[in-house]
Amino acid sequence: MQWGLYFIGEIHPASSAQHKWILTATDYFTIWIEAMPTRNAIDSVIIRFLEGHILSRFSCPRKIITDNAAAFGSKKMVDFCHRYQIALAHSTTY
């Protein structure tokens, strides 16, 4: 199972709850999409989203493909993927 993770944003103006980003996850097999508005595009938000919306509902993905945003390559994110034996891949820059 492969998932793609991406942040959409920064959105101007922010929502009434001050959300400026949307974190999206796409299951590449079923094309199922999960999304969550966030205030920040940081690694702790990604990990909380994965634990609460992906791992607990769909099982552990074998691979996560992301863009080259700093939050996806942080030490916390790499450690998280290593702990769950998830291969972390970054798409090419275009």
Question: Where are the predicted features?
Answer:
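Retroviral integrase
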Residues: M1-Y94
